[in-house]
């Protein structure tokens, strides 16, 4: 009678694989494996930590004023290297690593170096946007509220 192949069967060196078994094609090379992301290596990591702490302290007030979710896509060489979400719409406010859990009202696509200049106050956000230094998707007018939050944080 017909015998069903054992799906748990092992292939030993030199054996030919059975019908339902697959061949191991070798292991991935070192360069093909993704490198662990070290957040502290990014220029702006300490800035995000400070802003997150500020939101924890005064988040409830900010939620009343802002009522929006912002997603910051930080890029380097045209590729997104980091995403942060500032949720000032739900609960007492939150800032977390990763894309927005709920649909973001405004998404900023900002190069790492430009974001540093924005936060430090070297360049005006509106002028930088009009000059094409970063992109905004969604409700562009809400970006002015985020600018105020950064200014309040910078005063601390």
Curated annotation (Swiss-Prot):
Signal peptide range in chain numbering: none
Pfam families in the cross-refs: SCP2
InterPro entries named among the record's database cross-references: SCP2_sterol-bd_dom, SCP2_sterol-bd_dom_sf
Entry's transmembrane regions: none
Domain SCP2, residue spans: 44-156
Highest taxon of the lineage: Eukaryota
Protein name, as recorded: SCP2 sterol-binding domain-containing protein 1
């Amino acid at each position: 009678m017909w015998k069903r192949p054992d799906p748990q069967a092992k292939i030993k060196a030199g054996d030919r694989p059975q019908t339902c078994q697959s061949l191991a094609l070798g292991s991935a090379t070192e360069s093909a494996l993704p490198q662990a992301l070290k957040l502290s290596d990014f220029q702006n990591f300490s800035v995000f930590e400070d802003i997150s702490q500020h939101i924890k302290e005064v988040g409830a007030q900010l939620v009343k004023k802002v009522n929006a979710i912002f997603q910051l896509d930080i890029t380097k060489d045209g590729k997104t290297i980091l995403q942060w979400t500032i949720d000032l719409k739900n609960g007492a406010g939150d800032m977390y690593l990763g894309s927005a859990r709920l649909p973001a009202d405004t998404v900023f696509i900002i190069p790492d170096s430009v974001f540093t200049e924005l936060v430090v106050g070297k360049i005006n956000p509106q002028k930088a946007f009009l000059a094409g230094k970063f992109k905004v998707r969604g409700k562009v007018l809400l970006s002015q509220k985020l600018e105020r939050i950064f200014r309040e944080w910078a005063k601390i």
